[in-house]
């Protein structure tokens, strides 16, 4: 076996490029030459690597990605994906106030049924979210995202109703937004990132997100990538509407890419979920260009990590059951 090529920094290029695997593969799939990829890695991440190192990395990392569906028969795989899609859709939309039950949601998605006594908007929201799940799965192999992907997902997830120019679908917010929470027995308003600063902050977010996209080696790093993407996206709240649903979808991209089932925030945990996000954001302050660290550490963040780990168990159990049934 030949010696592993080492960069000027003394670290093997395989180790240096590993966190950016998805990014490198995405550039290659877009037709970018290995020489141009090496230069792009230098500009984006300060990596001093040769084009030969990039070519070698691509050769040794060309194997098919693992998937949580591996080892499951085609029939059970289809049923498992339907179950996860319906659960994810139900819980995410229920957190936002949708009144359809999980059974209702499955009937709407599977058979296109209309549930008596439920609003048209409730039906539209679950169909839109399920389409969002499909979109997320469709862009997995890109290994990175661009603003256009986030805009496309927003157009899919937020029903295309008549809006004014200050509430655009598929574009960053044009008006400041915020939320109210209880603190010390009184109602307190907390702003999100300003509309003027959102485009630049989202550039930061997308760059940081892509750096984590393909560098996941285990469940712990998958959980960390999810928490980072989810909470930092919510801090910015880049759209006038749909931010929670998009955060819960986008944050699962690195999780799915690494071969794990998605993390689904259960609807019954809605109050805990909202409270922990609120408490964390109050603890670290409003994000801005002057205070642009995307995810400052806080004890409140540890609380969220523990909750997310618990919530993940639902889909992990679904997969384990499907694999157990296949034996």
What kind of region is each of these model predictions?
Residues 3, 8-11, 29, 38-52, ...:
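FIC/Doc superfamily catalytic core
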Residues 14-32:
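Short, amphipathic alpha-helical "recognition" segments used to contact nucleic acids or chromatin
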